[in-house]
């Protein structure tokens, strides 16, 4: 489990951006304050940031893929992603990586709430 809050925040941001692009209607409509100034919509869904070991993250990734959920959106963040300086480098490294070479440091999942809670219920919020 990563302890550095800056790294955790960065990983969570990357995962959230991908989820936001891949899940329709995750971001709600804009709102307006009393002066009429617009504030862009934010997510309607809770996005808890949970702590887990690399092994647990890989286990969760494999578990959700095994369920064959039709509307599953799953994005992972590996040490390869963390260490790559450019997207081209990331793509090259991923293309040559075997599954055993992939060590996940984060995962973002959008699926049925019941399935997520069942799989992650034992994990604690990062504080």
Q: What spans do the regions from the language model cover?
A:
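Short, small-residue-biased leader/transition segments that mark boundaries at the very start
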Residues: 1-2
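Short, well-structured hydrophobic secondary-structure segments
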Residues: 8-60
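Short basic, glycine-rich beta-strand/loop surfaces that mediate nucleic-acid
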Residues: 42-51, 71-127
């Amino acid at each position: 489990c990563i302890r550095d809050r800056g790294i955790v925040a960065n990983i969570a941001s990357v995962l959230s951006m991908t989820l936001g692009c891949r899940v329709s209607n995750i971001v709600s409509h804009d709102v307006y304050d009393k002066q009429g100034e617009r504030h862009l919509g934010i997510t309607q869904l809770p996005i808890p940031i949970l702590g887990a070991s690399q092994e647990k993250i890989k286990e969760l990734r494999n578990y959700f893929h095994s369920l064959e959920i039709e509307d599953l959106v799953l994005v992972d963040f590996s040490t390869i992603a963390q260490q790559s300086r450019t997207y081209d480098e990331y793509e090259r490294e991923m293309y040559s990586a075997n599954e055993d070479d992939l060590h996940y440091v984060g995962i973002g999942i959008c699926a049925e709430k019941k399935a997520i809670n069942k799989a992650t219920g034992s994990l604690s919020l990062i504080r």
